């Protein structure tokens, strides 16, 4: 629903802010991953969204966001924006016009839980369902200009461990002018206290 809303409403130059708590934080991170992988088609082409989701779910290395195949896909699917400088350079080298860079202005999330609805105490069911949803790209992308993740330090339930970002140091080093734009901090309290 969030992706379709953006397709229908986004105009180049708009700022995009994405927020979520718990499983909603996982969904917010997945939405940003989908945007990074596919871009956004024109309003009149919202019917193309299933193509993007199918590619996003694929484990084929050719569908990774930075691959040349993905650049080709976005050229046809999302011609009015690029999702990275690498893609802009690729379009220029191929003789195509270079549209504006699509970015996420801010991603704010609280206590991301990666389990998509099946608690761990239903172990076999959780493994089947959660594995089938394992395509989600929840790593932080440099297309996000600033991001914060508040994580509860006192949560003791083993069924929903937090899903942490592992690449913040790298992103902060690559973007020193942004002054620690990417942060993941622990806060006192359990899951409901930090997010509620």
Kindly label every feature range from the protein language model.
Residues 1-196:
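Alpha-helical segment proximal to the catalytic Tyr-Lys
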